[in-house]
Amino acid sequence: MHEQYTPRDIEAAAQKFWDEQQSFAVTEQPGKDTYYCLSMFPYPSGKLHMGHVRNYTIGDVIARYQRMLGKNVLQPMGWDAFGMPAENAAMKNNVAPAKWTYENIDYMKTQLKSLGLAIDWAREVTTCKPDYYRWEQWLFTRLFEKGIIYRKNGTVNWDPADQTVLANEQVIDGRGWRSGALIEKREIPMYYFRITDYADELLESLDELPGWPEQVKTMQRNWIGKSRGMEVQFPYDQASIGHEGTLKVFTTRPDTLMGATYVAVAAEHPLATQAAQGNPALQAFIDECKSGSVAEADMATQEKKGMATSLLVEHPLTGEKLPVWVANYVLMHYGDGAVMAVPAHDERDFEFAHKYNLPVKAVVRTSAGDEVGSEWQAAYGEHGQLINSAEFDGLDFAGAFDAIEAALIRKELGKSRTQFRLRDWGISRQRYWGCPIPIIHCPSCGDVPVPEDQLPVTLPENVVPDGAGSPLARMPEFYECTCPKCGTAAKRETDTMDTFVESSWYFARYASPNYDKGLVDPKAANHWLPVDQYIGGIEHAILHLLYARFFHKLMRDEGLVTSNEPFKNLLTQGMVVAETYYRVASNGGKDWFNPADVEIERDAKAKIIGARLKTDGLPVEIGGTEKMSKSKNNGVDPQSMIEAYGADTCRLFMMFASPPDMSLEWSDSGVEGASRFLRRVWRLAQAHVSQGLPGKLDVATLDDAQKVIRRAIHAAIKQASTDVGQFHKFNTAIAQVMTVMNVLEKAPQATEQDRALLQEGLEAVTLLLAPITPHISHELWQQLGHAGSVIDAAWPSVDEQALVQDTITLVVQVNGKLRGQVEMPAAASREEVEAAARGNENVLRFIDGLTIRKVIVVPGKLVNIVAN
């Protein structure tokens, strides 16, 4: 065994062994417990960052631990390879997105392998390859024929200069990020998934996921947004609007109906269009609303603006005439594109009414009283007893809901209704680097799905986009085709699919990645699915995880899988954060400096109190800890860390520095500490092995000192097993290993029995570290005399007998204050313990002259003598 710990050589040798032995290739083994461990696959951006390293290390530790429990473990990896960054990089570097993507995959795959991940690389999937997306297209055609996918007009951000559609995040202050042109809202035909058909099931089956964080389930419940409310119709007539009809609104607060003082409609509402005829000012305002962002989050925070129309509607219960306003805070796609405004009890309506001097009428008695002041209070939105509401006065929310519904039904002007916030999922993207939508537009037959024998519709890979719309729409060689139904000239769809589609089913493809007769081999899929443990960032709590759940149900309904949910357990790992440093630039911005280029000064409590740039020695500002990012220049390159310290050190630091679901603060000194610890383990093992391996430990003849050492070993195994197996608390499991190391380093090695005990301790340390630091554990296991590989070794088991103490030390208190200790046989009776405590020399001094009133014995811990 080499005297020095040389991670580079040790890690290369271990990885070579795993590759040659195909150690992580798995096949279905009926009868053997399976465990499917999956970390969210990466976008091939070019280089791994520390967030990736943390994510994949957590997954790898879990996978290796489960293998040590004797399970058949699947841990695959792939690439979420379509998307906008590839198009942007292609334009910047004048290179085809395909070339850029495949080169990045090659580099990042090498990086992942250097971490020593226990991945079955034979199952690798790449979503931009036709052998992957052909099955996505196949499913699309099936769902289109069933009506689960449909086509309708949708509103998008249109850049008139670049002649292209922009994502919400590409619109900055109302202008295109590249062209700077003012963005317009446009209606274009798009394809949609009817995810709303599954809204109830997506909501209810969250209750079947006890292994998911409550926070994530709450976020999904809120996103689906099921609410029971009332559909209310406000009539209008010839005199008010020019024709008869009703304006439909949906409200979750029908109890406040008697407080409605105006109604507001979205800019796209038919009444807005009608009101704008002959009213240029209103038309200009409607156009302004239409040019704003289509993102709901932006609309929630933007300034509330509106314009009155000359139109009036009738209150359905009082007959009072209410003015119709066009308002930018009303969403056409929620409810019915119109709201009844109750300024006294809704904050948005309150703001709007105050801005435009509209009446405010309180109709609910809240904790703030019966009146509404000039400043909004949260209490105004509370449920309470109705006031100023005629025959409904005195009713609470539930009573008012029922009574007002009955009144509306009598007039045929309303009824209760369940509404969802969730909208159907629009998947059309006017981009090049995505999965082509397999539809042919025929002038005679309409929209025709591409027949299965003509799939995949292959994306040409030798294209360099120029940013001016989708190149596919300018490529007759791509879009010119014949109709599969009637044989006449037709045009292929040039939109591509939202890249969330690829990541919504990849977990199922891993079960049979080379299967060429369908999207999945149902037998293999049902063998492995659902995923036992899924690991990824909380930022995917809503969209990706909701779409993946939806797709799993679609696959179930196609007969491809039998389970209802894709992921049994979900672990959302925390961010990796690091210190930031900057100087204010001459233009008022900030120049950020990488922590590696900064020299820091700390106080006695290790808090950073000063920082200077190494190159010029001048001070820099301390920006505090933030998520590692390019924009703040506070990232640490994983490759440089692996080269300097080895993958095991990086893995150990990542697992020790913080519980996996909490933020992890990067610390160079923490990495140094992890490296020092592994060197200590190596040194102890090397010194032990160099003297020759000992014989078998004879547990029956251990002396008391040896029993203490063995107890420490097995206490650590017991605690680490609970920490890793039940709670994923890898940091506390590592702390247990460190405690054992402290004991083993001080343990005597004079006799054969001492050395046999050290052997047991080192084997336990190696096995407990094996999932976390697999390379050094691979080498140590062999050096400790084992013919098999540590990856095939079992997780250490606890010898409960080793934990039994022959003697125990009890604390003795007098009136709650520590006054002595007594050592007793573990099996001593209460009477014997009490007698020993009373007879303790030091205790006698404190009870001399006092009357003992009571003696409290807490078995195994303490004795408290109460005396006065």
Curated annotation (Swiss-Prot):
Question: Where does the record place it?
Answer: Cytoplasm
Q: What class of enzyme is it?
A: ligase
State any GO CC term. Answer: cytosol
A Gene Ontology BP annotation from the UniProt entry: leucyl-tRNA aminoacylation
Molecular-function GO terms, alphabetical: aminoacyl-tRNA deacylase activity; ATP binding; leucine-tRNA ligase activity
Q: What is its main location?
A: cytoplasm
Record keywords, A-Z: Aminoacyl-tRNA synthetase, ATP-binding, Cytoplasm, Ligase, Nucleotide-binding, Protein biosynthesis
Binding residues for ATP: 630
Q: Where is the signal peptide?
A: none
Q: Please list every transmembrane segment annotated in the UniProt record, as residue ranges.
A: none
Motif segment ('KMSKS' region): 627-631
- SUPFAM superfamilies assigned to the protein according to its UniProt record, in alphabetical order: Anticodon-binding domain of a subclass of class I aminoacyl-tRNA synthetases, Nucleotidylyl transferase, ValRS/IleRS/LeuRS editing domain
Gene3D superfamilies attached to this UniProt entry: 2.20.28.290, 3.10.20.590, HUPs, Isoleucyl-tRNA Synthetase, Domain 1, Valyl/Leucyl/Isoleucyl-tRNA synthetase, editing domain
Q: Name one Pfam family in it.
A: tRNA-synt_1
Query: What is catalyzed by this enzyme?
Result: tRNA(Leu) + L-leucine + ATP = L-leucyl-tRNA(Leu) + AMP + diphosphate
**What's the Enzyme Commission number for this chain?**
6.1.1.4
- Motif residue range(s): 'HIGH' region: 42-52
Instruction: Note the InterPro entries from the entry.
Output: aa-tRNA-synth_I_CS, aa-tRNA-synth_Ia, Leu-tRNA-ligase, Leu_tRNA-synth_edit, M/V/L/I-tRNA-synth_anticd-bd, Methionyl/Leucyl_tRNA_Synth, Rossmann-like_a/b/a_fold, tRNAsynth_Ia_anticodon-bd
NCBIfam families linked: leuS_bact
User: What family is it from?
Assistant: Belongs to the class-I aminoacyl-tRNA synthetase family.
Q: Which PANTHER family match?
A: LEUCINE--TRNA LIGASE, MITOCHONDRIAL (PTHR43740:SF2), LEUCYL-TRNA SYNTHETASE (PTHR43740)
HAMAP family in the cross-refs: Leu_tRNA_synth_B
The name on file for this protein is Leucine--tRNA ligase
